[in-house]
């Protein structure tokens, strides 16, 4: 994958297909699992390559992109996305922000609407750091401890658990193989590299803490598509419904019985592809 130096950081990216540009902002919070055993994003094979130029990239402190211990906000992460578009000579693009990529996409669309043809928000919400969910409190506590005790002290407390991958109940052979690779890689990685990944993950958590776009959703004027699984255990389906209610002109595509990682479901892929093709037909 090529790299681009933008907004003070080196980003790894990939571009597939030709046509109307679409930028995919991935989810997750970076860290060791994304770098030692990168995932393949389903969107890469979802869209017609003769009509859409799909651009995928690793956010800072994730995947093969640069790790930094600097503090930043979602404005910074949206600036990274814009910087990549500038690097590629792209003025406007369809933006797809999945899961933790959703708030970044919202920041980009609200701050620079002239750069966004249309916006898709799969399995995400306006405030992912909400204390309504246990993960929100856990991540906030981790950030606060990192600030008060220091990154190295927090790493010393977490090191053993960081070397054990989060269990997966996936039945997909490719994901099972990835988990096995990750398990071995986490045992082999040096403490110095694991510390770097740990700090990067915490910095990503921090960027979301005060980011709540609920009150500004009505400002969005571009076409908006929301895709959410009704059985999502990570980002509740109700959060997707809340986006739809607040963005009056948005489309809502519920995917029955689907969990998180919605774009890997056939129904979601069909909904996304259909929406993108309708958007393209209007701008062509």
Where would I find each of the regions flagged by the language model?
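Active-site loop/oxyanion-hole signature of alpha/beta-hydrolase fold enzymes
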Residues: 40, 44, 55-94
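Catalytic active-site module of serine/aspartate enzymes centered on a nucleophile-bearing elbow/loop
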Residues: 250-284
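Conserved alpha/beta-hydrolase "acid-adjacent" motif
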Residues: 233-239
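Short beta-strand/loop motif that positions the catalytic acidic residue
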Residues: 220, 226-228, 232
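Conserved alpha/beta-hydrolase catalytic His-Asp/Glu region
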Residues: 131, 152-207, 216
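Gly/Ala-rich beta-loop-alpha elbow adjacent to hydrolase catalytic centers
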Residues: 97, 101, 105
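Flexible "cap/lid" loop of the alpha/beta hydrolase fold
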Residues: 110, 117-150, 200
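Conserved HGGG/HGGXW glycine-rich cap/lid loop of the alpha/beta-hydrolase fold
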Residues: 5-67
């Amino acid at each position: 994958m090529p790299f681009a130096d933008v907004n003070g950081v080196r980003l790894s990216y990939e571009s597939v297909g030709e046509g109307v540009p679409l930028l995919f902002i991935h989810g997750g919070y970076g860290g060791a699992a994304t770098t030692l055993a990168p995932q393949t994003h389903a969107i890469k094979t979802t869209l017609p390559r003769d009509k859409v130029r799909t651009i995928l990239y690793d956010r800072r402190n994730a995947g093969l992109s640069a790790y930094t211990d600097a503090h930043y906000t979602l404005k910074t992460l949206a600036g990274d996305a814009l910087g990549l578009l500038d690097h590629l000579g792209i003025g406007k693009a369809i933006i797809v922000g999945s899961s933790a990529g959703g708030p970044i996409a919202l920041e980009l669309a609200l701050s620079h609407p002239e750069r966004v043809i249309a916006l898709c928000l799969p399995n995400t919400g306006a405030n992912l750091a909400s204390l309504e969910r246990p993960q929100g409190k856990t991540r906030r506590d981790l950030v606060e401890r990192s600030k008060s005790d220091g990154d190295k002290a927090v790493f010393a407390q977490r090191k053993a658990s960081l070397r054990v991958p989060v269990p997966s109940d996936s039945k997909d052979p490719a994901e099972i193989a990835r988990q096995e690779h990750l398990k071995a890689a986490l045992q082999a990685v040096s403490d110095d590299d694991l510390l770097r990944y740990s700090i990067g993950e915490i910095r990503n958590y921090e960027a979301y803490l005060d980011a709540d776009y609920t009150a500004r959703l009505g400002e969005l004027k571009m076409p908006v598509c929301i895709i959410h699984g009704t059985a999502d255990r990570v980002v509740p389906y109700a959060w997707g419904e809340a986006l739809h209610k607040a963005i009056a002109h948005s489309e809502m595509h519920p995917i029955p019985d689907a969990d998180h990682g919605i774009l890997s479901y056939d129904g979601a892929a069909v909904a996304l592809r259909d929406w993108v093709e309708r958007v393209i037909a209007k701008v062509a």
